[in-house]
From Swiss-Prot:
Location of the Post-SET domain: 985-1001
Domain of life: Eukaryota
GO cellular component: chromatin; nucleus
Region (Extended PHD domain (ePHD)): 620-744
Localization in the cell: Nucleus
Main location per the UniProt record: nucleus
Name of the protein described by the UniProt record: Histone-lysine N-methyltransferase TRX1
Length: 1022
C-alpha cells in the first residue's frame, strides 16, 4: 500500500520517523482508534515487517459460505452520520488522492450496512439496452447472494467451454457466471433458454435480473461436471485472451479515470520528440536519482515521468501528457510495434491492477537507494513474495479449474501462468509457466520393477525469485528439485542405473532415454500450442524470436482478393479433370484438390478447409511466415500454421508429404537474415520475405503481398525450361522467379479499342474451332447492322452507346396506375425483404448439392434482365450477393461438337445481328443456348468481370454454373470473361473498364496454343 507523506511516497514496508499526514478512513472516523503516532525504527531482530492497519475497499470473501455473524460478535461498522453524509463525501474526495493509489476504486458513500452498493457497469461489443451504453448511467445492483459460494454438487467445476461448435440448446439449464469488465467481477446465474431468431441465450442472474447474451462474445464460465460434458457433447474451450487484453486494460483505465490526473502516481501517455506516445507514471522530484541529468524546466509547466518498459526518467511539458484512458480510446496502444512497447503495456496493466510499480522501476528511484543493502534485500524478497502470491491468487484460479488433458502416459492438470517479470522462465525452445503441473507413470527409483506415478511441477525458486524451480515428486515420497527439467530426470535416471548395478534387474536401456522436456510434456505439440495461447505468452521474446514468429512489429494485413476464381495456392484459374477446384463451404476459399492435398473426390458433399473444420483452433491462427490473414494454411512441424504459398516460395521450407501437402517443415533452417528483411509492399517487419530475381535488385516482399500487388510471381520462362538436361527418372526441377515493380516483365500489348473501331472487321467463313472451357459468344457487331455504314454513322452510334444506362427489366405483376403512385416502389420494397432473407440463407454452411438446389429455386427472384450499357440486354442482380455465391446455371441444348460446328457455320453465322451462345463442357459435349435456355446467355463479357464460370458435378451430372467473383451490389450487372479463342477472328470488347484488353479474345491462351512442345526424348528416337 502506498501512503502519501511529506516529501514523497512511502510504502507500508518502509519506516518513517516523522508524523503521518494521511490516514485511512477507518481511523479518521473511529472513536476507539488510538491517536496515530510515528513508528519507531524496526530492530534488526524483527524478521517480519511491522503490521500496519490500513483501509480495504471490500472485505475478503470466504471460500465457503458460513452463517452470518450475530450482532453481538459482528465488528463495529465505521460510517459517518447520515445527516453529514453528503458533506463528508465532498470533503473526502480531495483527501483520498494518494490513498486511492493502493485501492484502485472510487470512494463510495458508505451505506447503512457498512458495504458499498455494487455499481455494475458493462463494456460490451454487442448492442442492447440503454444500460449497455458506454456513457450511460450505471445501474445499481443488489448482490446479496451473488458473491456467496453455494455448496455445489460433487464433481462440478467452473470451466470455459467451446461455444461456436457446440449445440446452442446444450447450454440451457447450466449454471454460469459472466464477467463484467468495468466491475472486474463475476456475476452468477443460469442459462434459461435460447432464441433461434436472435441467436442469443437468456441468462437469469441470482439477483433477479436477466438479459440476452451472445455467449461467443462474452467471458463466461459454466458449472459442469465431466459426466455432464460427455452427455451434452460439450468440449473444453480456450478463450480468445488476446482480445480480452485490451478490454481488461480499458476496464481498469475506466475505473480509475476520475482519479487520474497529472499528480505523482498517475498514469499518463508521455510524448518525447522522435518517439511514439509511451505509457508512463508521474513521479515526484524526490524520486529521481541525483545522477539523472534531466532537462530543466518550470515546475508549473512541466512534470516528471518514468516510462514503463524502458524505466527511464524525463521531464515533459504538460501538453505532451495525455490521460491514459483518453490515449486508449485514441488507439495510442497501436501506434508502436516495438517489443519493449508491448512490455510497457503489460507493466502498465499490472500497475493498474496492483497499484505497485515493477521492482526495477522502484530500484531506479531515489527513495530505494537510501536504505541499507540488507533492508533492501529483505524488502525485495518480501515484495517478490507478495507479488507471487497476488498473481497466483489473481490468475491461478482459472487454470486450476481446467479439465485435465490426457496424452497417453502424460496427464496435464494445470497449465499455470506466464511469468512476465523474469526472463528465466523461458528459453529459445520452451516456455515454463509457473504453476504448471503434470503427472506421468514411470519406474520407481526404489524398486525398478514397480511403476508408480510421478508429479512434475514448475515453481518459483524461494532463494532466487527470478529463477524457476522444477520439482518431481513420486508416490513413494521421493522429491527431486532442479534448475531445469533435464536436471531432475537425469537424477532419476542415475538412481535407476545405480539401483540396476546393485540389484540384477532387467532394466531396458531405452527407458532412460527421454529428455526432461519430453517427460514434463513441454515438447508435446499440443501442450506447446496451449502454452502459447496463455495470457502474456507473447512477452517471451527469446522463444518467439527464435521461432521466427516474433511479436515485435506484427500487424495484420487484410487483402481483399479480387480473383476469387483463382487457386489460393498456385494462383492459377485452369481446372483439369484430374485436378478440380474445391471451394470451402464456410470461408469460400478456392483451391485445387492437388494443391491442397485432397486425394479423394468429394462428389458434391460438404467440404471445409483445415481452419473451418470442427477440430480446427478456436482462434484463427496467423501465418508464421507473413502477416496476411486468411488463405490456404497448413500446420507446421513445430505446432504453428503457415500459408502453403509462403512455404512453396521460401527456399528453405518444404513439405514432408507432397501428396497431402502437409506438414510444412524447414522453418528452423530459414536464414536469420531473411527474418530481418522488411517488406516493401506492406511495410510490416514480420515474417520471412523473398527478394527480386533480378541480378542487381534486392527489393524484398512477402510472397502473398507480391501476389496481391500484381507483381510477377511465376515459374521460370517455359522457353528456358526445355534446355535443362534432366534424366527421365528424375523429377523436373522448376525454378520460381519473382520480380519487383521496376523489373517485372512487360505485359502483352493489347490492341486499343479505337484501332478496332477504325478498321472494319472482315468476316471470313472458316471452320469453327471449338474453344476449350469458355463461352462461344459473339457480341453485337455494329458493322453488320442494316442501313448506312459510313464512318459518320459508326461514330454516332459509338457516342450514343456511351450514354445508354443500365435499365433492368422488373417484373412487378398487375397494378393499376393512379395519381402519385410510383409503380416501381413496391417491387423495390419487396426486394429489400428478399435481400435480408437471402443474406440469412447464404450465411448458413451448406454443401454443393444444397447450394445448387437453392440457386435453382431462387434465381428468378434474385436476377432480372434489362438494357445493358455494354451491349444489348444484360443480366442484373436484384439483391446483394457475396463472393462465391452461385448466381445462375448456363442452360441450353446438349449437342455433340460436330453438330455445334454445323449449326454455327450453316445457320447462326447467316443471321444478321444474332449471337452464338455455345458453351463447351468437355471434348464430347457442348451446350447450345441460342434457341433454348435461360437468361444466363444474356450475361455480357467484361475484361474485369464480377463473375466466373465453372463446371461442377452434382449427383453424377455436370453443370455449368456462374459464380460471383466478388461481392455484388443490388442492380449491378453480371459479367464474366468469355475467353474467346480464335486464330483468325478478333471480336472487339466494349466493357469500358480501365484494364480492358480491347478484344474478347484470350490473347495469352492463343499465344500459348501457338507454341509447339515436343519432349526432348522424342527428338532422339530412331
Amino acid at each position: 500500500m502506498v501512503i502519501a507523506v511529506e516529501g514523497g511516497f512511502v510504502h507500508e514496508e518502509e519506516e518513517v520517523d516523522h508524523p503521518i499526514r494521511y490516514l485511512p478512513l477507518g481511523r479518521v472516523y473511529s472513536s476507539s482508534a488510538p491517536c496515530p503516532l510515528p513508528k519507531k525504527p524496526r530492530s534488526a531482530e524483527d524478521g517480519k515487517p511491522p503490521v500496519i492497519v490500513y483501509y480495504r475497499r471490500r472485505r475478503k470473501k470466504p471460500r465457503v459460505e458460513g452463517p452470518p455473524p450475530s450482532p453481538a460478535t459482528a465488528p463495529p461498522m465505521l460510517h459517518p452520520r447520515e445527516d453529514d453524509e453528503d458533506e463528508e463525501v465532498t470533503r473526502r474526495k480531495g483527501s483520498l488522492k494518494y490513498e486511492l493509489l493502493s485501492l484502485g476504486q472510487a470512494p463510495p458513500a458508505l451505506g447503512g450496512d457498512g458495504e458499498e452498493p455494487a455499481r455494475r457497469r458493462c463494456l460490451r461489443r454487442s448492442g442492447g439496452a440503454e444500460r449497455r451504453g458506454y456513457f450511460s448511467e450505471p445501474k445499481r445492483r443488489q448482490r446479496q447472494g451473488v458473491h456467496k459460494e453455494a455448496a455445489s454438487s460433487a464433481g462440478r467445476r467452473w470451466l470455459e467451454l467451446e461455444i461456436e461448435a457446440a449445440d446452442p440448446l446444450a447450454f440451457v439449464g447450466l449454471g454460469c457466471k459472466v464477467f463484467w469488465p468495468l466491475d472486474e467481477d463475476w456475476y452468477k446465474g443460469s442459462i434459461t433458454g435460447y432464441n433461434e431468431a436472435t441467436k442469443k441465450h437468456s441468462v437469469k442472474y441470482d439477483d433477479g435480473e436477466s438479459e440476452d447474451l451472445n455467449l461467443a462474445d462474452e467471458r463466461i464460465k459454466f458449472s459442469i461436471s465431466s459426466e455432464e460434458m460427455k452427455c451434452r457433447n460439450l468440449k473444453f474451450g480456450i478463450s480468445n485472451l488476446n482480445k480480452r487484453g485490451y478490454d481488461e486494460l480499458l476496464a481498469l483505465a475506466v475505473s480509475l479515470h476520475d482519479y487520474q490526473g497529472l499528480d505523482p502516481g498517475d498514469l499518463v501517455w508521455a510524448k518525447l520528440t522522435g518517439h511514439a506516445m509511451w505509457p508512463a507514471v508521474v513521479v515526484d522530484e524526490s524520486n529521481v536519482p541525483a545522477n539523472r541529468a534531466l532537462k530543466p524546466g518550470r515546475l508549473d509547466q512541466s512534470i516528471l515521468v518514468q516510462f514503463f518498459g524502458t524505466h527511464d526518467f524525463a521531464r515533459i511539458k504538460l501538453k505532451q501528457a495525455v490521460p491514459f484512458l483518453n490515449g486508449l480510446l485514441s488507439s495510442l496502444h497501436l501506434k508502436c510495434k516495438q517489443a519493449r512497447f508491448y512490455r510497457s503495456l503489460e507493466e502498465a496493466k499490472e500497475f493498474l491492477c496492483t497499484q505497485l510499480l515493477p521492482e526495477n522501476m522502484l530500484q531506479l528511484q531515489k527513495s530505494m537507494e537510501k536504505g541499507s543493502s540488507d533492508a533492501n534485500s529483505n524488502k525485495d524478497v518480501h515484495s517478490c513474495d507478495n507479488l507471487s502470491e497476488d498473481k497466483t491468487a489473481e490468475s491461478g484460479g482459472d487454470y486450476d479449474e481446467m479439465t485435465p488433458i490426457e496424452l497417453g502416459n502424460l496427464r496435464v492438470s494445470k497449465l499455470g501462468r506466464i511469468v512476465t517479470d523474469s526472463d528465466y522462465f523461458h528459453n529459445k525452445k520452451h516456455i515454463w509457466p509457473e504453476g504448471y503441473t503434470a503427472f506421468r507413470k514411470f519406474r520407481s527409483v526404489k524398486d525398478p520393477h514397480v511403476v508408480i506415478l510421478y508429479k512434475m511441477e514448475v515453481l518459483r525458486n524461494s532463494d532466487i525469485k527470478a529463477r524457476p524451480l522444477f520439482r518431481v515428486t513420486s508416490e513413494d515420497g521421493t522429491q527431486i528439485d532442479g534448475s531445469t527439467p533435464n536436471t531432475c530426470w537425469k537424477e532419476i535416471y542415475c538412481r535407476l542405473k545405480e539401483k540396476q548395478r546393485n540389484v540384477a534387474s532387467g532394466l531396458d536401456r531405452d527407458v532412460c532415454q527421454g529428455s526432461g522436456s519430453y517427460m514434463f510434456g513441454f515438447s508435446n505439440p499440443q501442450i506447446r500450442q496451449l502454452i502459447q495461447e496463455l495470457p502474456n505468452a507473447r512477452s517471451c521474446l527469446k522463444y518467439f524470436e527464435n521461432a521466427g514468429d516474433t511479436f515485435r512489429g506484427y500487424r495484420a494485413v487484410h487483402v481483399n482478393w479480387k480473383d476469387l476464381d483463382y487457386c489460393s495456392v498456385c494462383d492459377m484459374d485452369e481446372e483439369y479433370e484430374d485436378n478440380l477446384f474445391l471451394q470451402c463451404d464456410k470461408c469460400r476459399m478456392m483451391v485445387h484438390a492437388r494443391c491442397y492435398g485432397e486425394l479423394e473426390p468429394l462428389n458434391g458433399v460438404l467440404w471445409l478447409c483445415n481452419l473451418c473444420r470442427p477440430e480446427a483452433p478456436r482462434v484463427s491462427p496467423r501465418c508464421c511466415l507473413c502477416p496476411v490473414t486468411g488463405g490456404a494454411m497448413k500446420p507446421t512441424t513445430d505446432g504453428r500454421w503457415a500459408h502453403l504459398a509462403c512455404a512453396i516460395w521460401i527456399p528453405e521450407t518444404c513439405l514432408k508429404d507432397v501428396k497431402r501437402m502437409e506438414p510444412i517443415d524447414g522453418l528452423s533452417r530459414i536464414n536469420k537474415d531473411r527474418w530481418k528483411l522488411l517488406c516493401s509492399i506492406c511495410g510490416v517487419a514480420y515474417g520471412a520475405c523473398i527478394q527480386c530475381s533480378h541480378p542487381t535488385c534486392r527489393v524484398a516482399y512477402h510472397p502473398l503481398c507480391a501476389r496481391a500487388a500484381d507483381l510477377c510471381v511465376e515459374l521460370e520462362d517455359d522457353d528456358k525450361i526445355h534446355l535443362m538436361l534432366l534424366d527421365e527418372d528424375e523429377d523436373p526441377c522448376i525454378r520460381l522467379l519473382s520480380y519487383c515493380k521496376k523489373h517485372r516483365q512487360p505485359s502483352t500489348e493489347r490492341p486499343s479499342l479505337e484501332s478496332n473501331l477504325a478498321k472494319p472487321a472482315v468476316v471470313v467463313q472458316t471452320d469453327a474451332v471449338p474453344p476449350s472451357g469458355c463461352a462461344r459468344t459473339e457480341p453485337y457487331n455494329i458493322h453488320g447492322r442494316r442501313g448506312q455504314k459510313q464512318p459518320q454513322v459508326m461514330a454516332t452510334a459509338s457516342v450514343k452507346r456511351l450514354y445508354v444506362e443500365n435499365m433492368p427489366y422488373i417484373v412487378s405483376g398487375f397494378c393499376q396506375n393512379r395519381v402519385g403512385h410510383d409503380a416501381i416502389s413496391e417491387p423495390i420494397q419487396s426486394v429489400g425483404f428478399l435481400d435480408v432473407a437471402h443474406q440469412e440463407a447464404v450465411g448458413n454452411v451448406s454443401s454443393m448439392i444444397e447450394k445448387y438446389k437453392s440457386m435453382k429455386a431462387t434465381f428468378r427472384r434474385r436476377l432480372a434482365f434489362g438494357k445493358s450499357r455494354i451491349h444489348g440486354f444484360g443480366v442484373f442482380a436484384k439483391v446483394s450477393h457475396k463472393a462465391g455465391d452461385m448466381m445462375i446455371e448456363y442452360i441450353g441444348e446438349l449437342v455433340r461438337p460436330p453438330i455445334s460446328d454445323i449449326r454455327e457455320r450453316r445457320i447462326y453465322n447467316s443471321l444478321v445481328g444474332a449471337g452464338t451462345y455455345m458453351f463447351r463442357i468437355d471434348d464430347e459435349r457442348v451446350i447450345d443456348a441460342t434457341r433454348a435456355g435461360s437468361i444466363a446467355h444474356l450475361i455480357n463479357h467484361s475484361c474485369e468481370p464480377n463473375c466466373y464460370s465453372r463446371v461442377i458435378s452434382v449427383l453424377g451430372d455436370e453443370h455449368i454454373i456462374i459464380f460471383a467473383k466478388r461481392d455484388i451490389n443490388p442492380w449491378e450487372e453480371l459479367t464474366y470473361d468469355y475467353r474467346f479463342v480464335s486464330s483468325d477472328q478478333r471480336l472487339p470488347c466494349y466493357c469500358g473498364f480501365p484494364k480492358c484488353r480491347g478484344v474478347v479474345n484470350d490473347v495469352e491462351a492463343e499465344g500459348q496454343s501457338a507454341k509447339i512442345r515436343v519432349n526432348r526424348s522424342e527428338l532422339f528416337q530412331q
